[in-house]
Amino acid sequence: HPTNAAFANGIFGHCLDYEIQGFPPTHGTSSCLPSALALAEVGKYSGQKIIEAYVLGWEIQGRLRAASFSAANPAFHPPGMFGPLGGAAASAKVLGLDTHQTQMALGIAASRTGGLTANTGTMVKSTHPGNAARMGVEAALLARSGYTASDAILETSRGYADALFDGNMDWDIVIGELGASYRISDPGFDIKRFPAQVYMQNPIEAVLNLRNKYGLTADMVQELVLKTSGRGHSGSLPKTGLDGKFSVEYCAASALLDGEVVIDSFTDYKRFSPAMEQTLNKIKVERDGLDSDPVVATALLRDGRSVSDECGKFTGSAGNPMGHQLRMAKVWDCTSRVLDDSSGTTMVNLVEDMENIGDISTLMSIISQKTV
């Protein structure tokens, strides 16, 4: 069923913390794209329809997030709060719902929001976009069948903005110049080079820069100090490999130890390996509380030298584009686990020509099969 497919793919899309990140962060891809794909596969819709639905879902989700940013409770995880409406908007576009049906879909989705940031670093965090995608599909299907909800759920008393943000929603951001520009282009998004929280990207790249510049290995380093902002966890060692995706210490240790940070860097086996335990003991994090400053990595070497390097705008961030070779390395890190070279190449060619795919099931039939 498309609701189950959207749920599963929403989880898969977020569990590695590898998807692109908008501004402010809200995980629009793992909330909206699975909704659109699930319905389009069943209905045999085109790639162009997927693109339109994805852009629209991203737009609605991003506008709501930006409009309530100053009032958002940090205990709520953004894809759980905004994703169901983004998923509903994307689903409504795929199904071709009319104005009234779309209002109903958004009203239904608004009653299905939720997700707590206390679950960061655990498996349940990834269910927030999964639930968003599933609820988006379900809301649109229910609305199409005549299910009703408030037609003013965003602004009405005891509605979405009132309940979740104490009414503090900037409506100019929500509806101003709607359709004149699109948030997926402006302000755009970051592409993560590494499968970890976005706040880990600068620390990882700073350590890799340092390691490569001076030809370092973990054995050469007595202590590694990272001066960074207050974003991301630190101070306690990750309980699992998955938890390491949100730990400055672990991400830095992984970069120093292996000279790369990939999907396999975050297994439990890797987390509790003797080499990782030894390297983690060398990492020290100093917080400066400033988000805008670059991350500075300084290594005190066993031979007495002290060397430093930094990263302030990681590769893949807006303004520092990721080249094709690095993007493809990221793709193959993901696909090589399930697709052989031939299937993977076919998938890439189809995705790069998405707007000309007549039936999206052509693509889905490839990526849903294990060929290795």
What is each stretch, according to the model?
Residues 28-49, 83-97, 197-215, 256, ...:
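Alpha-helical support elements that line or immediately flank enzyme active sites
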Residues 40-139, 150-157:
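Glycine-rich, mobile lid/loop segments that gate access to catalytic sites or pores
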Residues 37, 65, 89, 172, ...:
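Short glycine-/small-residue-rich flexible loop motifs, especially phosphate/cofactor-binding loops
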Residues 7-31, 45, 49-60:
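Active-site metal-coordination/substrate-binding segment of hydrolases
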Residues 1-25, 121-134, 141-372:
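Terminal-appendage/accessory-domain detector
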